[in-house]
């Protein structure tokens, strides 16, 4: 099956000679130098632990997941790290769905050896309960387009996905202290993986019996080259892994030359990955700030409830303070308006006669005479002037009152009481007419 699929696409003799002749002149088909790297682009998805890497025409997507499992008996305090690759039929005519072929298995082994044997990921931090529960991290790599040098692109996709992955926080509790509680993302912030260094893979292609070496071979160059070697190094120059498939031998000097090239390139590639990851984390933190007010309802412990209650109290106090500030501002505005209106009235006042009348229009002259007589004041001829209906037309009302007239009227009233009407004095019997009770 592998032989049949491998023979589906071949370069012609003229194409092969053209590529080899160009390499002898230190030229490549895509215009690069022998040790130049193609353009690297890294993107991230909305979920934690998803990455998309494009190296020239090569397109690889990585996704990281984790689950709680029982640890291995020989390593009860360490988690596990596994890598799985999947070749899409759209990426290359030689790929077909189903069971992974030799190329897929080899790709997974190279990346796994560079990550796990170099101890790049701290597996001891993945332990939750020694001997019973640890985190198992799984990396899935999907080949979307094969433009050559799948190992380097897949390795960068795996590293980018691991650096942006977050696992749920968990605690050990319960009655016996052996119960593992996984906290949701809304309740507690997820935790990143502890990565000590970034092992970067670099692939070299050999031509003309190992006399010509190129870095980052393309799909066409891979069909012509007689051998290849993958070197995994970090930014410090430490060699993490070396993989050389094929039967073609290579001199020791060529291998050392490849190691020097990989070490010089590792720092630049590591810088690109870290910058992209930092930019993604900053964007993610901004989105997280907007998402925090809408927390999902969940049953939480006492300290968490207390924190929520304090948060509610502080929010209520802030609202009350805002309302009081609004009321104070409204009162200030109203007082300012009143002051301005009074100032305008005072400014517009020009002075003039008052229209105020101390007496009402329907004044009775007889009642006025009686009231003056009751006071006992000597009454003489007087005149009072009043203004009717607020107009300037004044009417003089002369009132002549004498003591005799007032006493005459009072005498008339007394005679009326004596003649016909009964008074309170008449109702009381004198002492002479009262009957003795004895």
UniProtKB/Swiss-Prot annotation:
Gene disruption: observed consequences: Bright green glossy stems and siliques due to reduced cuticular wax accumulation.
Q: Which GO terms describe its molecular function?
A: 3'-5'-RNA exonuclease activity; RNA binding
Q: Which Pfam families match?
A: RNase_PH (PF01138), RNase_PH_C (PF03725)
Location in the cell: Cytoplasm; Nucleus
Species name: Arabidopsis thaliana (Mouse-ear cress)
Superkingdom of this protein's organism: Eukaryota
Q: Which PANTHER family match?
A: EXOSOME COMPLEX COMPONENT RRP45, EXOSOME COMPLEX EXONUCLEASE RIBOSOMAL RNA PROCESSING PROTEIN
Function, as annotated, reads: Probable 3'->5' exoribonuclease involved in the regulation of cuticular wax biosynthesis by controlling the expression of CER3. May act by degrading a specific mRNA species encoding a negative regulator of CER3 transcription. Can perform exosomal functions and complement the yeast rrp45 null mutant.
UniProt record, GO biological process = RNA processing
Q: Where is the composition biased (Basic and acidic residues)?
A: 307-322, 334-347, 410-429
Q: Region Disordered: what ranges? A: 293-322, 334-438
Predominant location category: cytoplasm
Give the protein name, as stated in the record. Answer: Exosome complex component RRP45B
UniProt keywords (A-Z) are: Cytoplasm, Nucleus, RNA-binding
Q: What gene, per UniProt, encodes this protein? A: RRP45B
Family, according to the entry, reads as follows: Belongs to the RNase PH family.
What GO cellular component entries does it have?
cytoplasm; cytosol; exosome (RNase complex); nucleus
Q: Name the CDD domains on file.
A: RNase_PH_RRP45 (cd11368)
Composition bias, Polar residues: 380-394
């Amino acid at each position: 099956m592998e032989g049949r699929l491998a023979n589906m696409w071949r370069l012609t003799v003229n194409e092969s000679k053209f590529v080899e002749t160009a390499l002898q002149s230190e030229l490549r088909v895509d215009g690069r130098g022998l040790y130049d790297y193609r353009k690297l682009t890294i993107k991230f998805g909305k979920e934690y632990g998803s990455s998309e890497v494009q190296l020239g025409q090569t397109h690889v997507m990585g996704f990281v997941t984790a689950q709680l499992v029982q640890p291995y008996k020989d390593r009860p305090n360490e988690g596990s790290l596994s890598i799985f690759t999947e070749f899409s039929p759209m990426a290359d005519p030689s790929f077909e769905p189903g069971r992974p072929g030799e190329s897929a298995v080899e790709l997974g082994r190279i990346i796994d050896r560079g990550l796990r044997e170099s101890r790049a990921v701290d597996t001891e931090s993945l332990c939750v309960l020694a001997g019973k529960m640890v985190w198992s991290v799984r990396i899935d790599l999907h080949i979307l387009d094969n433009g050559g040098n799948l190992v380097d692109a897949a390795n960068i996709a795996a590293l980018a996905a691991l650096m942006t992955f977050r696992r749920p926080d968990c605690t050990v509790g319960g009655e016996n202290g052996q119960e593992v509680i996984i906290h949701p993302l809304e309740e507690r912030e997820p935790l990143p993986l502890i990565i000590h260094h970034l092992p970067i893979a670099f692939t070299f292609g050999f031509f003309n019996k190992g006399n010509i070496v190129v870095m980052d071979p393309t799909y066409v160059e891979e069909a012509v080259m007689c051998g290849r070697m993958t070197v995994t190094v970090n930014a410090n120059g430490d060699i993490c892994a070396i993989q050389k498939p094929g039967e073609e031998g290579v001199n020791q000097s060529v291998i050392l030359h490849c190691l020097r090239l990989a070490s010089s390139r590792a720092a630049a590639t590591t810088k690109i990955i870290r910058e992209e990851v930092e930019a993604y984390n900053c964007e993610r933190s901004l989105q997280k700030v907007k998402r925090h007010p809408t927390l999902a309802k969940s049953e939480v412990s006492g300290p968490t409830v207390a924190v929520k209650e304090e948060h509610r109290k502080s929010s209520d106090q802030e609202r009350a303070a805002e309302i009081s500030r609004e009321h104070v501002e409204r009162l200030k505005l109203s007082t300012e308006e009143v002051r301005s209106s009074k100032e305008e009235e005072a400014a517009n006042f020009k002075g003039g006669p008052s229209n105020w009348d101390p007496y009402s229009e329907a004044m009775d002259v007889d009642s006025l005479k009686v009231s003056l007589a009751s006071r006992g004041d000597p009454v003489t001829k007087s005149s009072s002037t009043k203004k009717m209906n607020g107009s300037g037309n004044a009417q003089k009302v002369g009132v002549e009152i004498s003591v005799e007239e007032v006493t005459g009227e009072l005498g008339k009233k007394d005679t009326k009481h004596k003649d016909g009407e009964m008074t309170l004095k008449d109702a009381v019997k004198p002492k002479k007419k009262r009957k003795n009770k004895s």
